[in-house]
C-alpha cells in the first residue's frame, strides 16, 4: 500500500516550487465520523465528553456540539476577486482503511487510477452565481441537509451587512452535481441514500480542477507530502493562517479539536497559548471599497448573557468560578445575580444618525422579538461615538432608568429603559407571557440586527448567533463583547468573544491581553476622527410626527449654522435654503 501510494503521489502531486496562485483555498473540512463528536466521545455519551486538561467540550462555532459535527462538509475561501468556478471539479479519494472499514466500491476509477479505492467528485454547474465570486467569500459544501443535522442551501450574500458566507447542499442539482463509486457502505448504510460526499480522517485526499482541466488546488491531504498529518476521527483539518492566493498543501494546515463552519478559523498558538483568529481583511477590503460605504451606521458592542440566578463568572457572591478565582463584576452594577438582567449596548458609527422609527430585531434559539423605537426628537440626531445601552429592568428592579444626559466629551453614554414608552413605542416577542417593554438577551446563540423606518436593513446580525461569530462559547455566566477598537466599518465579522471576568455596561470594553496578561481598553479614537456622517433622513418632518409644523421649525432653528437632519439639502450647513424647503412643505406629511 505504501509503495503504491508513493507512486501515485509522484504522478499526481506537483513539486512545491511549481505551485501557482489559486482562486480557491481549502480552509477547513470535517473529518469527524458520523457516530463521534468533535474532540472526543462516541455515541450518546460523547455529548458531554471533556478531554483531559480542558474545562469544556469542544464545539463548532456555528452548530455547537453535535454528533458527527454536521456530517461531511468542506469549506473554501475565494482568494481572487471575480473568480469564475463554473465547471470546476472537486475530486476526492480515501486511500487508507478507516477504523470502521471503507465503503465497498464498484471498481470504477472516476478520476483516481485505482477504482478499488472509494472516490468521488462534485462539479460546480454553469449557474451564473458561480461566474463572479468576490474575494473573501466563504463557500461551504454540505452532504447533509438541515433536517439531517447539516445545512440546506443558502446563497444569501450581503457583504455590506457582514454576510460573506454561502452554503450549498449537494442536493441542489442546479448548482452542483456529485458522483462516487460506492456499491455499499456496511459501516454506515444510511449514507448510501444521501448525497455523494465522503470525508475520511485517514489519508483522505482532495484536489480541485478548473473547467479547462488545469489544477486550481493540487492534490492535498494527509499523506500527500504536505504539512497535514495524523488526522483523527474526532478532528477537523483547518488552515491556521490567513487565506491568500498562494496557499497550498505546504501551508500551515493542522488537525483541530474545534471548528468554525462558515466563519474564519481560530486556533490556540502552540508557543504563546494565545487564541489566534484568521483575518479575511486583505481579501475583502477591495470588495468593500467598491460595494459599500466605509461608514456603517451603528454596531453592537456588548450584551449580557448571565442568567438571572447566576453571577458573572459563576460561583457565589463572595467568589467566582474563574481560574484563578476572583470577584467578576460589571462596572455599573457590581457583582449581582443576573448582572443587571437583559441588556445590550450599541455604538453610533456615523455622526448625526437619525434612528427615529427604527426596529431592533433580536433572536436566539427558538425565540425572537423586536424593539420599535419611537419618533422622539432624541432619536433624530445621535452623535458619533455615543454609547447607547438598552435595558429591561428599572433601577428599582436592579437595572437602570432612562438617562439621556450627554455632553459629547466627559459624558458620551445614554441609557434607554425599554419600559419608557416615550422612546420605545413597542416590543414584541414569541416568548410565552411577553409584555411590551420586555426583551431577551441570552447565551442561546443570541444576535441583533436593525432596520430603519422604511424597513431596510441598516445593521446586519451581530453577536454569538451570527454565522461568522468565531469567539469562545458564550455560557450562562458570561457577557459577549467586541474585543477590538470600535471602527467605522465594525460589523458582525469583528472579533466578538465571551467574557466571564468583567463587563462594562455603558463604558468602553476591556479585556485581558495575551501573552502579556494586562488589561486592554477599547479605543474610539479611529472612529471619532473618521469624519463619518450619517445620510440625511431626507425630509422636513424632522420630528417624524407626520406633519411639517412649528415643532419641525423649532428643530431647524435650533440647528442653525450647524449640520444634522435639518440640513435638508445636504450642503453641510443648516441655513436659509433648508428653511425654504421646510416652509415649502408646511402642513404636509413632508
Where are these regions (language model features)?
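Generic structural signal for beta-strand residues in well-ordered domains
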Residues: 13, 17-19, 67, 337, ...
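A recurrent domain-boundary module in secreted/ectodomain proteins
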Residues: 248-293, 496-538
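Intrinsically disordered, low-complexity repeat segments enriched in small/polar residues
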Residues: 5-8, 12, 193, 206, ...
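Sec-dependent, cleavable N-terminal signal peptides
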Residues: 1-22
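Activation on beta-sandwich/Ig-like modules and their edge loops
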Residues: 20-202, 208-251, 255, 292-444, ...
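Cellulosome-associated attachment modules in secreted, modular CAZymes
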Residues: 532-590
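Compositionally biased, intrinsically disordered low-complexity regions
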Residues: 7, 15, 214, 293-294, ...
Amino acid at each position: 500500500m505504501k509503495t503504491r501510494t508513493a507512486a501515485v503521489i509522484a504522478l499526481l502531486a506537483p513539486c512545491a516550487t511549481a505551485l501557482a496562485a489559486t482562486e480557491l483555498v481549502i480552509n477547513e473540512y470535517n473529518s469527524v465520523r458520523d457516530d463521534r463528536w468533535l474532540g472526543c466521545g462516541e455515541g450518546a455519551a460523547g455529548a458531554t465528553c471533556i478531554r483531559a486538561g480542558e474545562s469544556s467540550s469542544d464545539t463548532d462555532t456555528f452548530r455547537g456540539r453535535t454528533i458527527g459535527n454536521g456530517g461531511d462538509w468542506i469549506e473554501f475561501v475565494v482568494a481572487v476577486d471575480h473568480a469564475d468556478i463554473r465547471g470546476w471539479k472537486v475530486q476526492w479519494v480515501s486511500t487508507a482503511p478507516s477504523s470502521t472499514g471503507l465503503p465497498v466500491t464498484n471498481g470504477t476509477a472516476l478520476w483516481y487510477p485505482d477504482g478499488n479505492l472509494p472516490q468521488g467528485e462534485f462539479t460546480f454547474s454553469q449557474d451564473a452565481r458561480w461566474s463572479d465570486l468576490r474575494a473573501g467569500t466563504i463557500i461551504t459544501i454540505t452532504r447533509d441537509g438541515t433536517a439531517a443535522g447539516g445545512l440546506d442551501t443558502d446563497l444569501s450574500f450581503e457583504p455590506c451587512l457582514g454576510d460573506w458566507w454561502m452554503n450549498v447542499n449537494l442536493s441542489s442539482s442546479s448548482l452542483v452535481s456529485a458522483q462516487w463509486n460506492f456499491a455499499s457502505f456496511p459501516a454506515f448504510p444510511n449514507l448510501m441514500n444521501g448525497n455523494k460526499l465522503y470525508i475520511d480522517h485517514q489519508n483522505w485526499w482532495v484536489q480541485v480542477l478548473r473547467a479547462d482541466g488545469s489544477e486550481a488546488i493540487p492534490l492535498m491531504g494527509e499523506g500527500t507530502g504536505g504539512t497535514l498529518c495524523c488526522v483523527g476521527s474526532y478532528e477537523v483539518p483547518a488552515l491556521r493562517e490567513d487565506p491568500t492566493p498562494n496557499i497550498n498543501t505546504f501551508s500551515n494546515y493542522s488537525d483541530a479539536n474545534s471548528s468554525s463552519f462558515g466563519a474564519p478559523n481560530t486556533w490556540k498558538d502552540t508557543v504563546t497559548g494565545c487564541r489566534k483568529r484568521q483575518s479575511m481583511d486583505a481579501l475583502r477590503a477591495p470588495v468593500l471599497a467598491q460595494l459599500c460605504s466605509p461608514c456603517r451606521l451603528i454596531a453592537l458592542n456588548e450584551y449580557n448573557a448571565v442568567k438571572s440566578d447566576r453571577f458573572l463568572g459563576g460561583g457565589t457572591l463572595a467568589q467566582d468560578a474563574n481560574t484563578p478565582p476572583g470577584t467578576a463584576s460589571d462596572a455599573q452594577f457590581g457583582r449581582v445575580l443576573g448582572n443587571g438582567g437583559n441588556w445590550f449596548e450599541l455604538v453610533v458609527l456615523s455622526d448625526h444618525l437619525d434612528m427615529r422609527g427604527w426596529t431592533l430585531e433580536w433572536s436566539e434559539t427558538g425565540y425572537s422579538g423586536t424593539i420599535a423605537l419611537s419618533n422622539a426628537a432624541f432619536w433624530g440626531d445621535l452623535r458619533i461615538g455615543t454609547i447607547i445601552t438598552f435595558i429591561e429592568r428599572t433601577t428599582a428592579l436592579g437595572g437602570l432608568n432612562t438617562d439621556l444626559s450627554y455632553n459629547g466629551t466627559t459624558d458620551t453614554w445614554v441609557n434607554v429603559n425599554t419600559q419608557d414608552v416615550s422612546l420605545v413605542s413597542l416590543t414584541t416577542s414569541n416568548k410565552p407571557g411577553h409584555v411590551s417593554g420586555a426583551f431577551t438577551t441570552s447565551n442561546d446563540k443570541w444576535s441583533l440586527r436593525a432596520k430603519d423606518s422604511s424597513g431596510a436593513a441598516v445593521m446586519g446580525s451581530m453577536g454569538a448567533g451570527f454565522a461568522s461569530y468565531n469567539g469562545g462559547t458564550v455560557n450562562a455566566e458570561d457577557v459577549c463583547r467586541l474585543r477590538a477598537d470600535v471602527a467605522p466599518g465594525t460589523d458582525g465579522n469583528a472579533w466578538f468573544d465571551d467574557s466571564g471576568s468583567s463587563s462594562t455596561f455603558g463604558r468602553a470594553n476591556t479585556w485581558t491581553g495575551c501573552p502579556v496578561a494586562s488589561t486592554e481598553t477599547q479605543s474610539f479614537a479611529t472612529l471619532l476622527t473618521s469624519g463619518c456622517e450619517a445620510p440625511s433622513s431626507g425630509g422636513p418632518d424632522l420630528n417624524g410626527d407626520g406633519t411639517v409644523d412649528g415643532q419641525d421649525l423649532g428643530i431647524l432653528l435650533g440647528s442653525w449654522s450647524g449640520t444634522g437632519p435639518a440640513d435638508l439639502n445636504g450642503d453641510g450647513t443648516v441655513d436659509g435654503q433648508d428653511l425654504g424647503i421646510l416652509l415649502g412643505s408646511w402642513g404636509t406629511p413632508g
